[in-house]
Structures are given as C-alpha cells and as structure tokens.
C-alpha cells in the first residue's frame, strides 16, 4: 500500500499542560477527552506540554551517536542477561519474508541488585545495565545523561498512565498493581542507517519491520529525520508521522489493548529510513509488573480464571524471543 500523509487516520497533538496544572479543570477534561478519542481510534497521539527539557533530549541523542560510533567489537561486549545492553545490527525482525531489521540498539533500565532473587532466576529485564568502558566513552557523555533521562521519562510515564486511567471508568488507581514490583520499563536507543534503495523498493528492507508494540505504553522521541509510519487499519495505507521536536509520539501496545478488550487500539507501525543520513530515536516502554495478570479491567475484583491469564512476563518472553528468532523465507 502507498505511503500517505493525508488520511482519516486520527493522530492528534495533545497538549497535556492543562491536565498537569489542574486535572479537575474544564481544560483538563478536554485533554482527557482528546486522549480517549485517540486511544479508541488508533492508539496513537503526539504529546505536547510534557516538561522534558530540549537540552536533556539532545544530550541523549548525542550519547546515542557516540555509542553507536564505537567499534563493533566494543559494542558487542556491552551485552548482559535480561535484555540489557547492545542489540547488534540486523538481529531482530517482526515479519516473515523480509530482511532482518536494519537497526542497532542499546537497552537500559533500572539496575536491580545482583543478589536479588529475580536476577538469579533470570527473570525478564531483571538485572544490571551493561555500560561501555568509561575509558572509551566517559560516563559524563553516556551513562549520566541516559540515567537522568530515564528518571525523567519514568515520571512522565506515570503521568501518561494516570491520564489514560482518567479516560477509563475504573477509577484513578486502576493501574496501581500494574506499576508495582520494579515494573519492566526498558529505555531503548535506536540507530537506523540509511536503507539501500533497491531493497526498500522491493519491500524487503525496513529499519523496523511492521509490528505492534508488546507492552502497555510507548513514549517515542524522534530526531529530525522522517521514517516512522503507522498503518491505517481501515485502508491499509501507511501514514507518515513527521518528526516534531516538541512532541513525544505516544502509542498503546498489545497489553493495553488486551486489558481493555480491544476498545483501546494497538496499531501496526514500522520504520524505513530513506534519508541519506543516520536516523536516531529514543523509546521508553512501560511493560509493567512482571507478575501482573493481563485480565480485562472490567473483571478486576471479580471471579476470573487466573491460571488461564498470561502474566506480563509470560507475554513479554513469548513476544520478544519470537522476534529474535524469525528467519527470512
């Protein structure tokens, strides 16, 4: 299907500053209504008024560029158990019939002590970050800005979860259990080299092949290069999402769709870097409490067969391991 920037696809820009100033005001209710409309139509919206400083954002982009410029053997040593550290180029694919994704990544999160039983049992995303040697990439140029940005994004994520909770009829504490127990919240730096034009034309090479996000909520910061496309489920068109330096692209993932019985959407999207230069993005994922069971929110507190309901960890392991094992056919 062709790529379009004009479509009925609903991708609003929502300024949340009125909600932050007074969540009970008329202006805040308009914000809540706009977010609800986005959640029920496409699951995508652009977030403005978030309070994350441009200087902090740029420091993370600069850190990413420095890391990905390191020699391959150095990057490859920055790997750890629990989906932390370096993700090599072309190591992942979400689709059959295409080449492996033309991207590399670096994943960080909250450091969990090595003597924690969850680390010893190698539970999903439980472990230590895998930083590059400080003599090759000083902490001031990489680790510190990443850690500062991570804390800022964690706070913003709680705001977004509270805002989504306000769009639902289950009260302000509906996600409290979801957020407990050191929730898995991966921060992923991504580098997309320019894609070879012939392979792009054949539909064989993408930076990130078509997929829905696995978790509950995604907060995406794009650089000034285009590449993100979302599929209109009604027409099949791919809709380009132009970069906006002031906005985060927020989208709901499969978990949120699941617990709302599909009322809130998790849309298919992809990345193709057809620019002549490298593209970078920084993505914060809220995957949640590993032991949380993904039951419908309208059944919370009622009788429900818990044994037949996947936990967050079971869901994430199933989806994540699959994407690293797909082969081109």
Swiss-Prot record:
Report domain Fe2OG dioxygenase positions.
183-288
The record's SUPFAM superfamilies line, in alphabetical order, gives: Clavaminate synthase-like (SSF51197)
Q: Could you state a single Gene Ontology molecular function term?
A: dioxygenase activity
Binding annotation for Fe cation: 211, 213, 269
| Induction and repression of expression | Expression is stimulated under green light conditions.
Q: Where on this chain does 2-oxoglutarate bind?
A: 279
Metabolic or biological pathway? Mycotoxin biosynthesis
Please provide an example of a Pfam family that matches this protein in its UniProt record. Answer: DIOX_N
Which cofactor is essential here? Fe(2+)
Q: Which top-level group of life is the source organism from?
A: Eukaryota
Please summarize what the entry says happens upon disruption of the gene.
Leads to complete absence of citrinin production and the accumulation of a keto-aldehyde intermediate at the same retention time which is distinguishable by its UV and mass spectra.
Name the job this protein performs. Non-reducing polyketide synthase; part of the gene cluster that mediates the biosynthesis of the mycotoxin citrinin, a hepato-nephrotoxic compound to humans due to inhibition of respiration complex III. The pathway begins with the synthesis of a keto-aldehyde intermediate by the citrinin PKS (pksCT also named citS) from successive condensations of 4 malonyl-CoA units, presumably with a simple acetyl-CoA starter unit. Release of the keto-aldehyde intermediate is consistent with the presence of the C-terminal reductive release domain.
The protein here is known as 2-oxoglutarate-dependent dioxygenase citB
Q: Which organism is it from?
A: Monascus ruber (Mold)
Q: Source organism lineage?
A: Eukaryota, Fungi, Dikarya, Ascomycota, Pezizomycotina
């Amino acid at each position: 299907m062709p790529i379009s920037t004009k479509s009925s696809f609903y991708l609003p820009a929502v300024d949340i500053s009125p909600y932050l100033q007074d969540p009970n005001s008329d202006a805040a209710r308009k914000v809540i209504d706009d977010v609800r409309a986005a959640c029920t139509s496409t699951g995508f919206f652009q977030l403005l008024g978030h309070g994350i400083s441009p200087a902090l954002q740029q420091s993370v982009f600069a850190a990413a560029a420095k890391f990905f410029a390191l020699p391959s053997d150095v990057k490859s040593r920055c790997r750890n158990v629990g989906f932390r550290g370096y993700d090599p180029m072309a190591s992942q694919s979400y689709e059959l019939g295409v080449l492996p994704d033309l991207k590399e990544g670096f994943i960080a999160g909250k450091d969990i002590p090595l003597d924690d039983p969850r680390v010893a049992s190698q539970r999903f995303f439980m472990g230590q970050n895998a930083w590059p040697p400080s003599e090759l990439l000083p902490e001031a140029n990489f680790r510190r800005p990443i850690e500062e940005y991570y804390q800022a994004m964690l706070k913003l994520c709680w705001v977004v979860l509270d805002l989504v909770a306000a769009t639902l009829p289950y009260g302000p504490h509906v996600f409290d259990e979801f957020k407990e127990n050191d929730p898995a919240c991966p921060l992923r730096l991504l580098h997309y080299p320019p894609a070879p034009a012939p392979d792009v034309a054949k539909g064989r090479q993408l930076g990130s092949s078509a997929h829905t996000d696995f978790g509950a909520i995604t907060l995406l910061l794009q650089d000034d290069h285009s590449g993100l496309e979302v599929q209109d489920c009604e027409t099949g068109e791919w809709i380009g999402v132009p970069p906006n330096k002031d906005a985060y692209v927020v989208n709901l993932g499969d978990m949120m769709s699941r617990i709302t019985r599909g009322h809130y959407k998790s849309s298919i999207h992809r990345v193709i870097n057809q620019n002549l230069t490298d593209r970078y993005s920084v993505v914060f994922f809220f995957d949640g409490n590993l032991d949380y069971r993904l039951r419908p929110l309208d059944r919370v507190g009622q009788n429900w067969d818990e044994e037949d309901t996947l936990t967050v960890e079971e869901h994430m392991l199933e989806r994540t391991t699959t994407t690293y094992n797909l082969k081109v056919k």
